Amino acid sequence: MRVGVLGAKGKVGATMVQAVEAADDLTFTTGVDAGDPLSALVDTRTDVVIDFTHPSVVMDNLKFLIDNGIHAVVGTTGFTDERISQVQDWLADKPESAVLIAPNFAIGAVLSMHFAQQAARFFESVEVIELHHPHKADAPSGTAARTAKLIAAARKDMPPNPDATSTGLEGARGADVDGIPVHSIRLAGLVAHQEVLFGTQGETLTIRHDSLDRTSFVPGVLLAVRKVSERPGLTVGIEPLLDLT
């Protein structure tokens, strides 16, 4: 399988290039960065592209890849419901193309989201805290937003979080994602971390995941690269590849 990388000179992108080159069953074709022509992916007969770029360019990248029949594995964040809908519309015209978009490729992070969804209906209160390096472009992180949505869906028949706060500085209680408070921290020295805090009478539960190095994303990305062509259309998250759905 012939694999290209968009954002190849970025920190995550460079890690993906090394991972593809080290895989016996994959062939690295080309890396494309800002200012480079996307046509290089066609010229090198690339089958699958790994995209770790920026929310401001990822939609243009996807339109090009779908139009040219190149499968995409996307780790770039910033996908709103509207963006997901747009990708689905593009794919409807290209039924042979496949796109997998995941808010997080670290297996532990995916499992922590799954565990949080399972725990959600057993606790009265829940909040999400995500912690990242200060160069991250979006807040809250895609992982935190998806975690909150999964928790909210699991709690749809439950009352809202109890919270008597009536006054305070704007933003002090975090962002609201489908009724779940989400707090974002940006701090030098961090990579990618998340805590989900549950509370009820007499007990609390904390589910925490830490990516200490960007290599934590590699197993999930390579799994997606190998499987994406088997799933025409749009797949969100690697949970289906791990039999977690």
From Swiss-Prot:
EC number of this enzyme: 1.17.1.8
Principal place of residence: cytoplasm
Residues annotated to bind (S)-2,3,4,5-tetrahydrodipicolinate: H133, G142, T143
GO molecular function annotation: 4-hydroxy-tetrahydrodipicolinate reductase; NAD binding; NADP binding; oxidoreductase activity, acting on CH or CH2 groups, NAD or NADP as acceptor
Protein name as annotated: 4-hydroxy-tetrahydrodipicolinate reductase
Cited function: Catalyzes the conversion of 4-hydroxy-tetrahydrodipicolinate (HTPA) to tetrahydrodipicolinate.
Cell location: Cytoplasm
Source taxon at top rank: Bacteria
NCBIfam families per record: dapB
Family of this protein: Belongs to the DapB family.
Coiled coil region boundaries: none
Originating species: Mycobacterium sp. (strain KMS)
